[in-house]
Amino acid sequence: MKDFIEPFLYPHNLFLWGLLLAAVRYRKTGLWLLLGWFYLFGNGWVANQVRDWYNHDVIAAAFQPAFQGNFVVLGCGGSAEQLPDCAKARLQQVADLLNQTSHQQPAVHITTLFCEPYLAYLQPLLQRPVRLDCFHGGATTYHEFHTLDSRLDHQIPLWFVTSDYHAYRVSRLAQQQGFDARVYAATSSTFKPVNCGAACMLTVNLSNYDLFAKLTAELSSYYVYLLTYRFTNWYQQ
């Protein structure tokens, strides 16, 4: 009973039910539209369907230890002294893959302005000889891919290691640039299914808004680039 009642007392669910009462009381189209938007983007069942699609169609890729190519770790900010959690997750993920592969001496290409903390974090995790190539690829993902396009051999298979919320854009850009590549995503809590219990269809969850915010930013960024890259060159500068 506690698990059923408790979610209704959270501020966002009090707002949801208050909004429903206001929509019923005043019968305004705008209130109903706001209620529908707030409910659909916050509902756990709806968000879990989106997570299932994304996890299976965008980032689900099984790594084969017999892989004989190289790896690319896209930078995730930081400074000369510190690494953000997203960078640590990507480096941990690529280290796990490197320690599985049968490739005798694979290469890891890391695109970041601050190479020293990335390399210092990665090297103790490695259990085999690895060729490390760290360089500043550019200010954005699009700059990084422009640099990678001219720097890497397109005939060598690649695994791109990035964060799950970044995987859609990376997979599309790798395909567009003609790389023989797959994407391995370091997981975050945002893309893990939320518990959808007895109160699921009557409440909203804040983590679902975070999910849709990240997906909106990811898809918007990529499709703006797709519409403009043919007649602009900002991503090359």
What are these language model-derived features?
Residues 1-3, 103, 237:
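Short, Lys/Arg-enriched, disordered terminal segments
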Residues 18-23, 28-44:
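Hydrophobic membrane-insertion alpha-helices, especially the h-region
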Residues 200-237:
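Short, surface-exposed patches at the edges or C-terminal ends of soluble domains, predominantly
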Residues 1-24:
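Membrane-embedded alpha-helical segments of integral membrane proteins
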